Amino acid sequence: MDYEFLRDVTGGVKVRMSMGHEVVGHWFNEEVKDNLSLLDEVEQAARTVKGSERSWQRAGHEYTIWMDGEEVMIRANQLDFSGDEMEEGMSYYDEESLSLCGMEDFLRVVAAYREFVSKA
């Protein structure tokens, strides 16, 4: 899982992720932004579910993050609509609306994000 952190013209941090993990970047860009307390909450939840059968979920404005002891899933909240709402012959492209990654990989990105933000 490759990633890149950038600063926009206003100084805000933007995250770009490798193909297949774009939604993780969108989650950082839309849900986290400068809200490092959200990362505190996510890291605490990761410690709670790690090595257990439990899972944790937090719905944000645009994306929901879900994790269990081994993996993290981030999905766009818009995925909640049913296929019955689409016209016949149409399919919904959701490759950039759902990402799965390992817990350790995700926590490495969180740590790198914190480090990048702190160098402002």
Curated annotation (Swiss-Prot):
| Alphabetized InterPro entries for the sequence | UPF0231
Pfam families, sorted = UPF0231 (PF06062)
Q: Which family does it belong to?
A: Belongs to the UPF0231 family.
**This protein's name:** UPF0231 protein YacL
Q: From which organism does this entry originate? A: Salmonella typhimurium (strain LT2 / SGSC1412 / ATCC 700720)
